[in-house]
């Protein structure tokens, strides 16, 4: 009876999440009032800055939900960056508990609204205005209002999804948007191979699929890998028996699992949103009259610049995000309070330094791997023209969301069964 109730509750949660994700996708296809889609389609070729708009909104045309959770993610990044700098924010995060976290969430929502208005205004007055006939201030304000409301709704949907405790709402929205773009990628891939000679296309396709599946396995291994830091209690250290050697006792001890990719997909999410800001001046430079005679060289330089920016940002946000999630000093203090220690490491400052060293090393290695996924398409594209390699970071996000959601569902089922046994 209890098991059937648990399953029905789980089905209800999944149905609610799928409904909210469907609403997010529908928002992408509801056109902004007063903006004709055919004019925007022409603008993609006539206005070189429309490429930047497409990157920003994540869609080929403009819908009221095109901004999505981009302002929400940017606001979260800004709040996290400001927290260590302002004592009041740090106190709310560390000392106020749930009430403090709710207050920080409230600040994040306020900042999301402000940032959504800024981005909507930039899109309306700098990108849509030059390619729209009959422009007026009223039309501009309607566009800003539509995009802002769509972004706020996306933020609300993300928080509702997170409240179901089956995964992160923002990550799931990014996931569903990536999945929505898969048909276009497969269509372009089929056109590539249909245009090629069939005899040469089959070996190329098999080679590409083999490499792609290998990368999937590597990503899964990377996502699930972690380092064990053995910890022992004071009683275990003092316990000496002839039947149990020290090495045997250590083998049975508890440990702290530190994931190799502690930041998960968040460094990629952060870097992709911030990279857009750095790409803005590069897009202007590329479209300027000074580079009209060197368009090919400018395009290559822009590609190298793009990968370089993403490489640096991914490593930075990998280390930064881990520093927010894991606090070596707090971990050391908690171990001391529980009378646990790391074998061979003294309690106190030495434990803090050791944990800091291990965490920083893991964060850097994780950042390098994420950066490798960003760089890999650039190198493999010189040898294999395989469209799926262009979205390896998206692949990592897909795998990360799937594994995280699976573990959350498993944890939910286990916890409900445990509560039923009480």
From Swiss-Prot:
GO terms for cellular component: chloroplast thylakoid membrane. The keyword Plastid applies. It comes from the Eukaryota. It is a multi-pass membrane protein. Keywords: Chloroplast, Membrane, Plastid, Protein transport, Thylakoid, Translocation, Transmembrane, Transmembrane helix, Transport. One of its GO terms (biological process) is protein targeting. The keyword Chloroplast applies. The chain crosses the membrane at residues 17-37, 61-81, 114-134, 141-161, 166-186, 202-222, 265-285, 306-326, 364-384, 394-414. It is found in: Plastid, Chloroplast thylakoid membrane. InterPro entries: SecY, SecY/SEC61-alpha, SecY_dom_sf. Gene3D superfamilies: SecY subunit domain. Belongs to the SecY/SEC61-alpha family. The central subunit of the protein translocation channel SecYE. Consists of two halves formed by TMs 1-5 and 6-10. These two domains form a lateral gate at the front which open onto the bilayer between TMs 2 and 7, and are clamped together by SecE at the back. The channel is closed by both a pore ring composed of hydrophobic SecY resides and a short helix (helix 2A) on the extracellular side of the membrane which forms a plug. HAMAP family: SecY (MF_01465). Component of the plastid Sec protein translocase complex, which is composed of at least SecY, SecE and SecG. This is Protein translocase subunit SecY. It comes from Emiliania huxleyi (Coccolithophore). The lineage of its organism: Eukaryota, Haptista, Haptophyta, Prymnesiophyceae, Isochrysidales.
């Amino acid at each position: 009876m209890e098991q059937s109730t648990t399953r029905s509750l789980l089905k209800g949660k999944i149905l609610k999440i799928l409904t909210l994700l469907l609403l997010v996708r529908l928002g992408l296809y509801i056109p902004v009032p007063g903006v004709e889609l055919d004019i925007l389609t022409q603008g993609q070729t006539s206005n070189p800055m429309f490429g930047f708009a497409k990157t920003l909104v994540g869609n080929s045309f403009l819908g009221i939900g095109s901004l999505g959770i981009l302002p929400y993610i940017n606001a979260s990044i800004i709040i996290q960056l400001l927290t260590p700098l302002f004592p009041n924010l740090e106190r709310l995060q560390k000392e106020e508990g749930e009430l403090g976290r709710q207050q920080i969430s409230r600040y994040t929502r306020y900042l999301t609204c402000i940032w959504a208005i800024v981005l909507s205004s930039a899109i309306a007055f700098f990108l849509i205005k030059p390619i729209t006939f009959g422009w007026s201030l009223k039309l501009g304000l309607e566009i800003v209002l539509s995009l802002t409301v769509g972004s706020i709704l996306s933020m609300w949907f993300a928080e509702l999804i997170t409240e179901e405790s089956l995964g992160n709402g923002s990550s799931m929205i990014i996931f569903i948007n990536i999945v929505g773009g898969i048909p276009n990628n497969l269509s372009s891939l089929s056109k590539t191979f249909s245009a090629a000679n069939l005899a040469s296309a089959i070996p190329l396709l098999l080679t590409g699929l083999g490499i792609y599946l290998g990368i999937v396995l590597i990503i899964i291994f990377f996502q699930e890998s972690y380092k064990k830091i053995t910890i022992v209690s004071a009683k275990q250290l003092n316990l000496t028996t002839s039947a149990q050697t020290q090495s045997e006792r250590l083998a049975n001890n508890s440990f702290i699992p530190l994931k190799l990719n502690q930041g998960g997909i968040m460094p990629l999410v952060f870097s992709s949103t911030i990279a857009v800001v750095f790409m803005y001046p590069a897009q202007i430079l590329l479209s300027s009259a000074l580079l009209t005679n060197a368009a090919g060289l400018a395009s290559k330089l822009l590609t190298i610049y793009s990968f370089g920016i993403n490489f640096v940002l991914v490593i930075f946000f990998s280390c930064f995000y881990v520093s927010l999630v894991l606090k070596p000093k707090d971990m050391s203090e908690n171990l001391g309070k529980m009378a646990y220690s790391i074998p061979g490491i003294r309690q106190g400052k030495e434990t803090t330094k050791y944990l800091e060293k291990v965490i920083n090393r893991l964060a850097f290695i994780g950042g390098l791997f994420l950066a490798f996924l960003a760089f890999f398409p650039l190198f493999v594209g010189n040898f294999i023209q395989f469209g799926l390699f262009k979205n390896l970071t998206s692949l990592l996000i897909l795998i990360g969301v799937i594994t995280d959601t699976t573990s959350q569902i498993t944890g939910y089922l286990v916890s409900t069964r445990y509560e039923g046994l009480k």
